[in-house]
Curated annotation (Swiss-Prot):
Residues 361-439 form the OCT domain. GO terms for biological process: ribosome biogenesis. The keyword Zinc does not apply. This is GTPase Obg.
Amino acid sequence: MERIEFIDVVDIYVKAGDGGNGAVTFRREKYIPFGGPDGGDGGDGGYVFLVADTTLSTLYHLTEKKKYFAENAQNGRSRKQNGKNGADLVLRVPVGTIVKDYDTGEIIADLDEPGKYCCVARGGKGGRGNTHFKSSTNQAPKFAEQGAKGEEKHIQLELKLLADVGLIGYPNVGKSSIISKISNARPKIANYPFTTLVPNLGVVSINGTPETSFVVADIPGLIKGASEGKGLGNVFLKHVERCSVIVHVIDVSGSEGRDPIQDYFDIRKELEFFSKDLAKKRELIVGNKSDLLTPEEINAVKDRFLKEIGEGILLISAVTGQGINELKYAMWDIIKESKKMYVGTIDITKIEFEKPSPVRLVLPDRVDIKILKNDKGEFIVESEYIKSYLEKYKMEAKFMLEDVLDILQKNGLDEKLKKAGAKDGDTVWVEGVDFIFKE
């Protein structure tokens, strides 16, 4: 039978930092009131990285907000001072997380090893200050480059959950109710095409931090004969193999007409039939529905488990909440011990992230020119290239008219104006600035 995977899915938006703008400044010193350009460059925007961290078991910590931003860079300053780069944003995810582009479904990365990382959004390149644009024909450039915008992306994170705790027991013993009491979140679970039976998972947090969160799974389908393939027992038993703790949930009230001790032995038998290693896992015996027992009956149940099984039983009530906190901490104590045995733990604060090239402002490949005519008989020049050019150098056309006209004329502006019917003395507009056409 097909093996079932528990898939946790989280969708988030990430935005890298914008590059800082280059500065337009000039030296202002004693005896040099009108010195040359000294504008510094803008810094580069921060990047967004995802890194696989062995201390995490779930994606729950990334559900607290939907949007994540790296820091924008600072602008350049006078005296050729460059702006500070924006801080990178590093998001930690569990080992085994698959990163996808939400819109296309394309896999960006499979973070299947501790410390493995990927860049999901590049920061913008900082703009150059006016110092870079001094030339023999322009000793005092009054323009500089604009910083590029950082990348933004909608990504989907998928994690094949490895449940830390498996709740096993007969149907109707209250496993789902226990999960609803102890857990803070319900992961978004993938659909199973061959069954309407959906595994019930919960994320438990001890003190609200990702490092103290763990996954609890209700393993359904466990009935007598499960190890022989009855129901879906053997499929879900495969998942229990990966748990750190097995919690036997038993109905101590006897409301289903079964004996609690016999229930325990039946489930243990199924585990041993399926896998000897599985039967050796750390276990907790939990007696649910204890609120239906009298104090005398509670003492009798405890004594009987100690005498006949040799282990104590933790009595709880998923209805009243009695013993729930004690159960959470008992599970966490065992999980902590198992996590100490993990190998390959990496200090992600010491990782030196390799960065791809930042996003740069790029001008269109060609100079496009479109001529329109308004109601006054004036000609309007439209050009995406010129718009991009002015954005790149954060200047209004009136301050760069000579440069703009030079670019346009080299690409056939005069011929296009004549073809559109322009004559000597007509008014022509380019990005809000007018000039007189001369043949």
